[in-house]
Amino acid sequence: MIKEYREKYNSEFSEETYEKFIKYLDGLCGHKIEFRIAETPIFLPDHLLTEIISASDELTSAISTKEFHDFTRNAIPPGLETPNEEPHPSLLSIDFAICKGEDGKLHPQLIELQGFASLYCYQELLNEAMRKFFFIPERGKSYFYVKDHEEYVEEVRKAIVGDTDPENVILMDIEPEKQKTYIDFLATEKYIGVKPVCITEVIKRGRKLFYKRDGKEIPIERIYNRVINDELERRKDVKYNFSFQDDLDVKWIAHPNWFYRLSKYSMPFYKSKYVPETRFLSDFEKFPDDLENYVLKPLFSFAGVGVMFDIDRKVLESIKDRENYILQKKVVYEPIIETPDIPAKAEIRLLYAWDDKPLLLNNLVRLSKGKMMGVDFNKNQSWVGSSIAYHNRTF
């Protein structure tokens, strides 16, 4: 999107270099990455970066209010509340589509917020590999309010480990080695010393949790939680020894209640030019006539499961539990990233840590040429997948 950078990058790109880049990235943690990595980063022009920062500032201010807490009081499904909720999420992701406005300029539109973990450590691996193999401008940086690798890793460490011994912190997921995000788990261990542990290996004694290392029980003081709630609900074969509803003597990073509060449930709360019109399906007395301009989303699903783009009145009228769906104005991604064939669309995720205030650290990008982001909509495509954005600003 910065023309001179794009032209230079594309002219210097080669498939041979890309293959070396992938091999190097796989080798950094000794693990073959299972999701597609795009052939290119994106280069954010300053005017677009200004709008992205402005939009994210609006949103972080909104979720800090009492009104937001009141609005999302019922976001957590009955029986799934975790005790000892904190007043804000310790980790936060904000996803924006890059769109073109009526003024012909690029603008961000909110896709979703998540009070949940993301690929904080993998993105630093990707940044390192991108810089080694491809043209990245000397001024180009992926960080925001940190200046370099050391400061970035330290802020991630503070958010996840804090003052705790890393041995007493676990990254918890369901069969972590089988997750597509396992590369991030390995990168987390590489950078901050926190090891992945399967939820089935956690031991409960009273209010305390433990895991075993070399035959010895190690107390758990912090859980860097990577368990996706709806995956856990589906996996009836997974037996574990505690409940998320237990009053436990641990600190959650991030607290599980924020998975629900900062989800599609909160979208109708935000009133901003950066947020597409969104309402609970149950709030409609009469459905819009132009349903082709709307998308239907279930509240409690992950990774695009259940999202319907082509809807009609009959579909909406057949839904009984309308309070569990939102109807949202479609966001039109602008195919703006020049590639060797057709332009790609971009979605940028801002990665925050939140102690006393939200701190914007890094970003993650997804590129697509399909109807939606994600592998199922980009089969047999190149220059799509996981990526990163660079900008020229010093914060």
Regions found by a protein language model. Give the residues of each.
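Preference for protein termini
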Residues: 1-395
